[in-house]
Amino acid sequence: MNRNLRNRICVLAALFMMLLPAGCSWNGETRSREYANTPKGNFMALWTIMDEHYCFFDFKKETLGVDWDEVKVRYAASISDDLSDRSLFEILCKMIGELRDGHVNLTSQYDYGRNWSWKTDHPANFSKDLQDKYLGTDYIIGGNGYSYRVLDDNIGYLVVESFESAMSDNRLNIMFNNMALCNGIIIDIRDNGGGQLTASESLASRFTEKKVTVSYTCYKTGPGHNDFSKLYKNELSPAEYDLRWIKPVVVLTNRGCFSSANDFAFTMKALDNVTLMGD
């Protein structure tokens, strides 16, 4: 097997583990092991990295019936030392695709291996044309990734397309000033692919006047599927500004919400004045 592809597969698999949420982090011994520079060796390297570092095997078994040991046996039958690099890559992509996890991807010069069935197998539940109709042409661009306006029925409409960029405190202050007389706010995060957790937290912190426990995190502590730390609270603190919103809020979601957009949704769900609508 081409050494460059072999190195790329192993390194990217390790990088994938580093890119998982903090609850999935564990610096174990897998990356220091030596595997033969063959299709079988690379197959076992990737399977083992996943086996010892991935956090959600019990959940995937319960909800999808995924048995990771059975997956190894089934896909190992397709691995032989005369496989081409491309064929090996495609098999490895199918193997990790069994998990149906949008954060689990493998890339190479041939393609970007992914499983997006969590979105593509379901209705979009979103119309950009309808969103544009409500925004109109005289909307305000608050910053990179979000725009807003006050609708005719005195409801604020905030479209957050991305959390890729930081949300300036000054710009958020201006936005909430502009919508101060509104009876409520609709926050539309449909098809928001995520971005920075700090950006989503900055926005969410404007909707509470007290510290709120929004979720719990445990950390991967070893190679076993159930090697986790105790639970730690994740708390949302109110923004250190007078401009906070305590009137009703509706957050619109769909399956296009991903990563930090999901974080924003479940954080907002913990607040008393917020209603989530969508899937």
Question: Could you describe each region identified by the protein language model?
Answer:
Residues 1-31:
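Bacterial Sec-dependent N-terminal signal peptides
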Residues 23-219, 224-235, 248:
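Flexible, low-complexity junctional segments that flank or bridge functional domains
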Residues 185, 258, 271-279:
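Short, well-structured beta-strand/strand-turn elements
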Residues 191, 251-260:
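Active-site neighborhood of thiol-dependent amide/isopeptide-bond enzymes
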Residues 240-252:
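Short, conserved helix/loop micro-motifs enriched in His/Cys and acidic residues
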